[in-house]
Amino acid sequence: MDMSSANSLRPLFAGYPFQGQGRVNQLGGVFINGRPLPNHIRLKIVEMAASGVRPCVISRQLRVSHGCVSKILNRYQETGSIRPGVIGGSKPKVTSPEIETRIDELRKENPSIFSWEIREKLIKEGFADPPSTSSISRLLRGSDRGSEDGRKDYTINGILGGRDSDISDTESEPGIPLKRKQRRSRTTFTAEQLEALERAFSRTQYPDVYTREELAQTTALTEARIQVWFSNRRARLRKHSGGSNSGLSPMNSGSSNVGVGVGLSGATAPLGYGPLGVGSMAGYSPAPGTTATGAGMNDGVHHAAHAPSSHHSAATAAAAAHHHTQMGGYDLVQSAAQHGFPGGFAQPGHFGSQNYYHQDYSKLTIDDFSKLTADSVSKISPSLHLSDNYSKLEAPSNWSQAAYHAAANYNAHVAQHQLNDYAAAAAHGNPASAYSHPLPTQGQAKYWS
């Protein structure tokens, strides 16, 4: 490409026609940095506001920023003038013409008089409401600026020398009455209204249009006020309930503790016998490929045998051993732990044809474990009537009650027989193998898959 062809290229965008300091705002309006808006645009803003047009609509139609529109309207409401250049706006007049005339006379009599001296003289002369010292000083400065001493006008128009510098007072003060927007007062609810709103909020946090109409009729409130109240009430509920349910797991948040523990790996965990059946199964997770065997149950027996206080109802479902204040065989459990009897010796919960503790936990459901625990504790510790309470509950439709009661009776017989054998073994110091019975393997129905 030669130089002639390169010089012949022209940019696609040649710039705006006004050039110079002109800029385009977000709304597409043209403005010049440092220059106030033209007077006709200021006048149009005031006229549109007086006709009831909102400032946001004025901003879009005239392509002037919302902040500029608000500033012009506020200054016009305070001073009655749309002339630019007075930063912060001038203060409205608070003195009467008689006081201004008297202040001007006192100043002419003594040009070096102070503002506080003028105020004292006004009070002595009997003026009922004399202006403050700052107001008198402002009047004195205004009269100095108004004097014909040839000083320059240091307003923005005077400095910039714009085309609006020769605007007359009638153009800068159009005299259009502009209504000040009144702020809505806060709504005060009566006790009856709050009670009706709270009742509706307890039913639903997001009322539909029919609920809002009904509340509007009963409470004599507008639907808009009702909608705002529900929004604020939901926010208050989220604020107060943000950290109240921290630390609760889904398994044990709704269950109630009945003082039953499971001795797993030497620890006792409280069981919640509530809506979900068991509340602390989430705390145990056996290693992959392993099952809970008698070793862990022996640890549970030893831990339960050293329960320190009678105020705790700690027991273990592994050995089904309850507190010594509720079970006379407390010494039996302790001696069994010392002689090394097999774990699960007093456990009548060989539910079905398999021992629960020799089963993988993944093969059990919550309902299976709940029935197993309730039956085991009730047979070993007669003071806990969980089996009676459980029989009063509504049973699922897929349970075989006849098979369950048959298995429960058989387990009770085996448990009593084992307790008698181990009591004799503990009394004579014989080894446990001489009295141990094989686990029941037939005659019962299985309750898990």
UniProtKB/Swiss-Prot annotation:
DNA-binding region(s) from the entry: 20-143, 182-241
Compartments where found: Nucleus
Residue ranges of the region described as RED subdomain: 98-143
GO MF term set: DNA binding; DNA-binding transcription factor activity, RNA polymerase II-specific; RNA polymerase II cis-regulatory region sequence-specific DNA binding; RNA polymerase II transcription regulatory region sequence-specific DNA binding
Protein's UniProt keywords contain Hydrolase: no
Family matches, as Gene3D superfamilies: Homeodomain-like (1.10.10.60), Winged helix-like DNA-binding domain superfamily/Winged helix DNA-binding domain (1.10.10.10)
Biased composition regions of type Low complexity, renumbered to the chain: 306-320
Expression sites (tissue/organ): Expressed in a single-segment repeat in the neurectoderm during germ-band extension and later in single neurons during neuronal differentiation.
InterPro entries: HD, Homeobox_CS, Homeodomain-like_sf, PAIRED_DNA-bd_dom, Paired_dom, PAX_fam, WH-like_DNA-bd_sf
Secretion signal span: none
Family under the similarity heading: Belongs to the paired homeobox family.
PANTHER family the record matches: PAIRED BOX PROTEIN PAX-6-RELATED-RELATED, PROTEIN GOOSEBERRY-RELATED
Function: Expressed in a segmentally repeating pattern to define the polarity of embryonic segments.
Protein name: Protein gooseberry-neuro
